[in-house]
């Protein structure tokens, strides 16, 4: 699964987990040696679950941060840079805590664009979705290198249905 990749690619790096849910990708990043993780989610309940997951894995919160926020609004304000960014948004959200309704099909270009602004040079971003009818708008992101890596990110117990989720590696195009 993709969260295992986070553990393999984050040693000595900073890691941002957007729509973090229970922070499993952040746990894997921390166990893989990330020097800092930042997990952002709208739900304090899920972030508290994430904190428990860190504790259960023996990881102190010292360099691992949990931010309750509307991801889109937070991305517009954040100034920190990260080496690895993981984006796993819901298909749809209309929470009262958000500034706007979120729709992954409609909003993914803006989401990825905002996240890429926070990526360090030579950094890497991963965008994942479980929306089965999702179509990546490559034309609107021609300035990025987009590589679909879905087959390598699906756990063995889900191999029978390769459309269970889709995942892309996103990086700036080589100049």
Language-model-derived ranges and their functions:
Residues 10, 58, 118-120:
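A generic alpha-to-beta junction signature in SAM-dependent methyltransferases
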Residues 43-86:
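S-adenosyl-L-methionine
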Residues 124-175:
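C-terminal catalytic and target-recognition region of SAM-dependent MTase-like enzymes
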Residues 12-21:
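Conserved class I S-adenosyl-L-methionine
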Residues 71-74, 78-145:
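S-adenosylmethionine
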């Amino acid at each position: 699964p993709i969260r295992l990749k986070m553990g393999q690619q984050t040693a000595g790096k900073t890691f941002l987990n957007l729509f973090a849910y229970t922070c499993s990708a952040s746990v894997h990043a921390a166990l893989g040696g990330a020097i800092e993780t930042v997990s952002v989610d709208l739900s304090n309940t899920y972030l508290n679950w994430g904190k428990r997951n860190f504790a259960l894995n023996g990881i102190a919160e010292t360099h691992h941060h949990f931010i309750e926020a509307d991801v889109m609004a937070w991305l517009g304000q954040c100034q920190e840079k990260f080496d690895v960014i993981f984006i796993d948004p819901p298909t749809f959200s209309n929470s009262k805590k958000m500034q706007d309704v979120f729709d992954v099909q409609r909003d993914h270009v803006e989401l990825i664009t905002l996240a890429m602004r926070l990526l360090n040079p030579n950094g890497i971003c991963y965008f994942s979705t479980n929306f089965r009818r999702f179509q990546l708008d490559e034309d609107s992101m021609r300035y990025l290198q987009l590589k679909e890596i879905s087959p390598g990110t699906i756990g063995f117990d889900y191999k029978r249905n390769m459309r269970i989720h889709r995942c892309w590696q996103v990086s700036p195009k080589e100049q």
